[in-house]
């Protein structure tokens, strides 16, 4: 059924073609550069091989004889057959060789053992692994202790999901938090944006859930609806072999739909604090069996608009609940909350410096009226996979998106005053590469992880170092390289100096030519 609506829904501007899935150019191309890093998917079992060459005729003869022997054994006494097959199956290769009296028996035992060996490794060989990510990575994610995911004794089904998601080995924050979370300890973790924090709590949460138990066992709280959708998607992908039911619940969506969904099994609930508290008070969302509460972007969740809801929500949890708090910044509000609800947490601090190592930061002094012209110059000179452009107000977001479209570049926009359905659609399409550029407010700074974004532009310079940190953290995700360009007016100059001092980082003057190696490897 056709619903009458404007030709271009909110968030979509009418100009420029939109940079197609992987590899297509968009609009006027933003100064070239293949889009989205080329074809990912496909490839099947990279780095893994099949079961080896076909057996030679001699081997086939042995296999045939082994089959005949096995059929002959089946006709013997029941107890004898059980004991002999059990014994033969678990003999090790060296024991089998010693025990074998004839070539036929040795071949039969070897064939059985080969089947046992392959079955123990088969699950890895049969995984549908994505193409390996060969881009350069910084120490933010490579400076690990050398652990593997298998070292944590996770369920095999969870390991399958981890590897198929493209995770190869744990990042530093994952190495620190996964084993501690599995012991049941409370955690207060501070790590940079884009270093794998989401998986650091999703993996232990999925490991601890019992799929046979029809109850909400883990709640993950996040500050924005977009982050809730993204986090739930990560949980679904990592846990796709676990038969765990994941639900998202946020404000701005139908309460009736959430109520109906909660009458079905739900093991893991991801959402914003207000909506989850509302459902809990109504008695629809029952948290008496919830053993783990995760707070992602904890500093934002403890802002005045969220903190009362969170404190009320904690009272619905059992006394022995586990609390995990993750954030890049921990202001005073977090310390007060910690003293009240986390008396003895395990503290993880991986913040020797605040900004990501892979992000190169520049500023350009401009007059307000020159900003659009300056942006046009950046588009023509930079090799942009995808860019996020930040403004300080909703009105300026829409105006700038219109200007960018008039310049001939593909552009979406997103802000908090849009309908939730429109926000979801813009977020989904931008993530899937339908467009090169996204103009937005600070709504989009928290935890949003889009790997193809290699350039962030602060069209309006932020007022606080915390906002700056979260904005530039949208590029250079998971140790890859990124570029942050700040357009600075005369009024912004003191803010620029102050933010440099607070973050202990250097924001350099933009050079006439930017080396591709600093943001495109």
From Swiss-Prot:
Report the GO terms under cellular component: cytoplasmic stress granule; P-body
Q: Report the domain of life of the source organism.
A: Eukaryota
Principal location class: cytoplasm
Q: Where is the Helicase C-terminal domain?
A: 358-518
A Gene Ontology molecular function term of the record: ATP binding
Biological-process GO terms, alphabetical: mRNA processing; mRNA transport; negative regulation of translation; P-body assembly; stress granule assembly
What are the binding positions for ATP in this chain?
Answer: 191-198
Q: Where is this region: Disordered?
A: 1-97
Q: Where is this motif: DEAD box?
A: 296-299
Biased composition (Low complexity) is annotated at: 51-89
Q: Where is this motif: Q motif?
A: 147-175
By sequence similarity, the record places it as follows: Belongs to the DEAD box helicase family. DDX6/DHH1 subfamily.
Q: Please give the name of this protein.
A: DEAD-box ATP-dependent RNA helicase 12
Q: From which source organism is this entry?
A: Oryza sativa subsp. japonica
